[in-house]
């Protein structure tokens, strides 16, 4: 792997005796890993568990496998898994993932929340926010909204609101060079300084949203001191209410430069790619805040259609605020402020759509619910799964009463479909379809 001369000089000076091992690590294959999803009812025994993190396993997963399609597994390399683990938000808390795409850290945070509390998952880039929505929907979480806006606009709505803020900042990406060698072409001597300033600009607004007594997790996938310890020093200098919290150094982690409380991950020490993580605690006394919540905007007919569907097909009562956007029905987490001035990419859990005096359940609802929460479900075989994901109707071995059924693959929800006799009509979203 070829590096710019300035990069070589920089890390020879920074790492000294370790520099040779550091550069040699780039000739080794990038480490692949994934996480399992604890929100899913049916779990499996996967091999090669990562000792440092819950739900983590070494290895590769196929994006066309049933485990991936049902949201049971999510691909994420080991070092990146450390960020949400450092955050480890408590159940029922309010969490912000400030720069969230493609969704690895958000889905990991949702694992800790366990369908309680609230996650606001923000991504300013519209194309990347669509990928974020897709990944969160597949994960099956109910307590998350996805926003597509800037930190300054979010701060006007969520001032002093979040118990945990995770900011995995846009960075020079040095830690991903082994995984994505093409990224090297963007690196130049001043690039880390340029990115460090961007990180500070975003944090200037982002920190306004941290509640008294809350925690900030700042991370990057680079080793640049300008973007890491330099930003940590800036945070402490400009935010006297924040103090660093020591991160336990798990196998292969290193202390940060000048800030031993922070953590660095190098590929010649840690079995993974590159990462930096810092944890801050707000010293202010936590306050009880009251949020003026919105009200359901369903009309009488829509309310009746939803209640009829829920009574007939669901065994559980879904907790949250029902809101209609166009003809689409969403379930929003409780405790949200007015979001009318925020660009939203996903308004909570999409329940379905109203069509000509009937209600059709969404794929998102069917993948979020467990089989214990629905009245009727049908387990697809692997051959039937292959037919369904390619957009075909599926023929069952026996007939069923006509109506809506939750589809299951290996016991986990895979959307709703309408069954007529022994035929499963295809309701798998066209944008997700693929051929096996």
Task: Enumerate the predicted regions with their spans.
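S-adenosyl-L-methionine
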Residues: 124-159
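Helix-to-beta-strand junctions that scaffold the AdoMet/dcAdoMet cofactor pocket
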Residues: 114, 210-212
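Mobile active-site "lid"/loop adjacent to the S-adenosyl-L-methionine
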Residues: 127, 163-202, 221-228, 250
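Conserved class I S-adenosyl-L-methionine
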Residues: 92-101
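Conserved SAM-binding loop of SAM-dependent methyltransferases across substrates and taxa
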Residues: 102-115
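A short acidic, Gly/Pro-enriched loop at the edge of an enzyme's catalytic core
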Residues: 90-91, 155-166
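Polybasic, low-complexity RNA-engagement segments
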Residues: 1-14, 18-41, 273-276, 283-436
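Class I S-adenosyl-L-methionine
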Residues: 162, 215-218, 223-330
């Amino acid at each position: 792997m070829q590096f710019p001369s300035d990069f070589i000089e920089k890390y020879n000076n920074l790492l000294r005796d370790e520099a040779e091992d550091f550069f040699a690590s780039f000739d080794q294959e990038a480490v692949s890993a994934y996480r399992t999803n604890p929100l899913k009812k049916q779990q499996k025994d996967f091999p090669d568990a990562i000792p440092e993190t819950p739900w983590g396993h070494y290895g590769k997963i196929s994006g066309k496998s049933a485990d991936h399609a049902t949201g049971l597994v999510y691909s994420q390399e080991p070092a990146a898994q450390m960020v949400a683990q450092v955050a480890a938000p408590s159940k029922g808390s309010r969490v912000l993932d400030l720069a969230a795409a493609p969704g690895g850290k958000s889905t990991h945070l949702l694992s800790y929340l366990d369908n309680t509390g609230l996650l606001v998952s923000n991504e300013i880039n519209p194309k990347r926010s669509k990928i974020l929505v897709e990944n969160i929907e597949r994960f099956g979480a109910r307590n998350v909204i996805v926003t597509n806006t800037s930190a300054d606009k979010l701060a006007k709505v969520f001032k002093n609101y979040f118990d945990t803020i995770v900011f995995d900042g846009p960075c020079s990406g040095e830690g991903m060079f082994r995984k994505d060698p093409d990224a090297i072409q963007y690196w130049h001597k001043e690039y880390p300084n340029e990115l460090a300033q961007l990180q500070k600009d975003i944090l200037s607004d982002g920190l306004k949203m941290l509640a008294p007594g809350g925690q900030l997790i700042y991370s990057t996938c680079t080793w640049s001191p300008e973007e890491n310890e330099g930003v940590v020093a800036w945070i402490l200098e400009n935010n006297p209410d924040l103090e660093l919290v020591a991160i336990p150094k798990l196998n292969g982690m290193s202390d940060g430069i000048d800030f031993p409380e922070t953590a660095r991950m190098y590929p010649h020490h840690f079995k993974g790619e590159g990462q930096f993580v810092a944890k801050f605690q707000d010293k202010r006394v936590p306050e009880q805040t009251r949020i003026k919540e919105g009200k359901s905007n369903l009309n009488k007919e829509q309310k009746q259609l939803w209640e009829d569907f829920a009574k007939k097909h669901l065994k559980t009562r879904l907790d949250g605020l029902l809101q209609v956007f166009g003809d689409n029905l969403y379930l929003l987490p409780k405790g949200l402020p007015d979001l009318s001035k925020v660009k939203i990419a996903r308004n909570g859990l999409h329940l379905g759509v109203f069509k000509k005096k009937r209600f059709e359940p969404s794929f998102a609802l069917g993948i979020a619910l467990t089989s214990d929460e629905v009245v009727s479900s049908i387990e697809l075989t692997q051959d039937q799964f292959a037919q369904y994901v390619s957009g075909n109707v599926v023929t069952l071995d026996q007939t069923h009463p006509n109506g809506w059924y939750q589809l299951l693959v290996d016991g986990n929800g895979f959307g709703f479909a309408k069954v007529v006799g022994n035929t499963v009509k295809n309701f798998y979203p066209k944008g997700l379809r693929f051929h096996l």
